């Protein structure tokens, strides 16, 4: 049920209420019985003959009817207590919000501030702070227990099927276990193969994990600009994106009220929030890259660390010596962050301050456990530029920086392209694994062709499914508005659903143990003509039912054994069902007549012909109408039985 509630004019409206025939459930890990790990249970119809299906859920408390949502107050900050219990942190006053943090916006255009204030935490001394440091010391945190329970989707009871799925897939070197334990999570993080993006100041977070040996995740980008959108719209877009399955959200705001927008989003977000700090730093120096300084950038990092941003995209691999490699490209440097740093390097003829101060950036981010998302500022912006020397030179540098960040105790993932034709995708994954020590890969698509403006969610979804199969851990969505404009609410949903399809297809191909459970449930519902179950098991129940209802709108059609594609006469599944039922009900003498010894093909043919004849007679007897009353169909079925 989609309810956009706005009880007063100062509170952003967000979507609450559960999805059709679903309820929020909570799993309790044996290792930490005080934790409540959210799942969504899809409730199947009474005649389904199978249990309800638990699935991964990113929607937070917004779909839990027992929780009262107050966007002004923000979400519960249960995780803050976990951080404090571990020790090694201090609470402090933090920096004051400065006018330039919000673009020096005037009073007439200033957004309403988030009123609740929480003193920030930061790490002190040499005690472990980051999930990587805990993992390296052999310590299992509550976050690790939480994500292990979340990834399993209640499949402990279905290990036999899980092992069969593993055997059937092609994982390209990934090692997904049949059942995920907290120790497995710890080991993957300790090896640098997975991250839990979880700033110690994001107390509202429901922890999740990014790594190729886990479910493939997706990210949704939101954010205002200098010409469009507002704080209210961006908070609503965040809630809307996670409703449909976004595992993380990046706030790429570039206009007014950047700090305020981010605060509202963070205080109301149960998923990790990422940013590109150079965007805000640029706003603080009037949009002129030449005026950027290390001191200004560092202050911006501290500002965002204190707010609770979980991961930063930092384009530290855009080095002065690589910029000339883009000169002969068709589309040059298309990354906004990459172009900002390239201009700074050329204007000052110096090495990037992101590269020269990388050690200091690591020390700062470690104090708050902000994860690195090492940006691909030289990614190809057209398939003509894919896999060129500029792209791979930067990737090699990102590998070097990954090792530095690990040595400093930081969590790291690597960003990737971009625009890459299908036959050049796998080499990107292979090279990233080699150069970056198997750190998680996070790609924008890639887009597999450049000919479809307005449909780039499809061109990129193809590449995303492929690279996800090859081992990419998180896929950044592309909406239909890519290259054309800022996505609205509907574009966000289309982008998220498209990328959920790509991620799920990748998990199926890898042989992820839990992936096919949902596919099989949909298939059984489809074969049994359980229309409502088929809608509700899908990624987008509302759209599925709307498409069905365009041609068969009545409630009676929800039990009809056909759809508008074939009609009642030509439904292959209905005919198959009738053949099965008919053959099962034959007596021995009837079977002998239809199944002569040594003539298996003839016997099957006889059953089919007889079944077809009965269906033909039944159709004529009921008036040869394309659409039939459900009650009459039921009566006819009783007469045949």
Swiss-Prot record:
Query: Known catalysed reaction(s)?
Result: 5-amino-1-(5-phospho-beta-D-ribosyl)imidazole + S-adenosyl-L-methionine = 4-amino-2-methyl-5-(phosphooxymethyl)pyrimidine + CO + 5'-deoxyadenosine + formate + L-methionine + 3 H(+)
> What top-level branch of life does the organism fall under?
Bacteria
**What's noted on cofactor binding?**
Binds 1 [4Fe-4S] cluster per subunit. The cluster is coordinated with 3 cysteines and an exchangeable S-adenosyl-L-methionine.
**UniProt record, GO biological process:** thiamine biosynthetic process; thiamine diphosphate biosynthetic process
Tell me the route in metabolism or biology where this protein functions.
Cofactor biosynthesis; thiamine diphosphate biosynthesis
A Pfam family matched in the record? ThiC-associated
Q: Where is this region: Disordered?
A: 1-21
**Which stretches does UniProt call biased (Polar residues)?**
1-13
Cite the binding residues for [4Fe-4S] cluster: 563, 566, 571
Tell me its EC number(s), please: 4.1.99.17
Q: Does the keyword Iron apply?
A: yes
Name the coenzymes or cofactors required. Answer: [4Fe-4S] cluster
What keywords is this UniProt entry annotated with? 4Fe-4S, Iron, Iron-sulfur, Lyase, Metal-binding, S-adenosyl-L-methionine, Thiamine biosynthesis, Zinc
**What's any one GO cellular component for it?**
cytosol
MF (Gene Ontology): 4 iron, 4 sulfur cluster binding; carbon-carbon lyase activity; zinc ion binding
| Residues bound to Zn(2+) | 419, 483
The record describes the protein's role as: Catalyzes the synthesis of the hydroxymethylpyrimidine phosphate (HMP-P) moiety of thiamine from aminoimidazole ribotide (AIR) in a radical S-adenosyl-L-methionine (SAM)-dependent reaction.
Kindly state the subunit structure of this protein. Homodimer.
Q: Which family does the record claim for this protein?
A: Belongs to the ThiC family.
Q: What is this protein called?
A: Phosphomethylpyrimidine synthase
Q: Provide the species name.
A: Rhodopseudomonas palustris (strain BisB5)
